[in-house]
């Protein structure tokens, strides 16, 4: 009589266990969906991040390199900069950085364009781009965004207003023989910056407006913009002008009326981005920093710096916490690509390491995304 009762009890316990396990597993899957849904990033937010980084570099170069050096050193920015020993015009600097980023083949692309271009390559390439440009000229407070459905793939595109933020911009356009417009003033919308983000293969018959981007993809885009601007600044500004004995880069660049070091160029623009409080940050960090404030801020950054020093071909990524908030971080190797960088670190009295060579890993660029 006990055997049937035992079987009933055993079956009951087994059923309760299976039901409980099913509920736990279902909750675990739900939690994972909520987690990844929370950290994935809408393309509009990703485009805002990218534009903020582009704009910070554009403003700093225009105001603190071009305009400042024109006043303090009589060093001009000219169209034929390569042959005249001068600075690149702000739009040439952005063109060079966008070409560098676009050639990396990561999918994201950006470029400068205008309704009044001096060079036809900067004109809108479609009727929709022209409509978008007109929209941001009329209402510069909001970007013009849309999703393009090309075959089986989708692309998010956004046009942001490009303001006249430096005297060099208005002077060039107002005085250029090929300029269709010659009455620009400071603060005017002179054109737009278009950002193109691939969203992947289309999964439904209609355009999917709810596609999200993984944070590591967005971090890659941001790093691409940062690294491209730094590369152009190091190669075409610092190294070129120093090689020609025109102007040098120094640590005390403001007081000495000189060029900022490439590392300072990055740190100055990162501060501009940080001040806008968008939930985005990028910094230059190192295990052997000249300035201790540029060391790793947490254990994740320390481990990440060690990882990219051993495996510089890929970033070190992960989710952690900072100041009580969930963050996603990606650490990319910072390579010695400029003789100016090497000379500064190897000769600086406070440098812990003095034997850097070209293409050595000198530290890392950490991109931080605050998760909503």
Positions of predicted regions on the chain:
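Extracytoplasmic c-type cytochrome modules immediately beyond a signal peptide or single-pass transmembrane anchor
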Residues: 21-168, 178-337, 350-372
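Cys/His-rich metal-chelating microdomains
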Residues: 175, 347
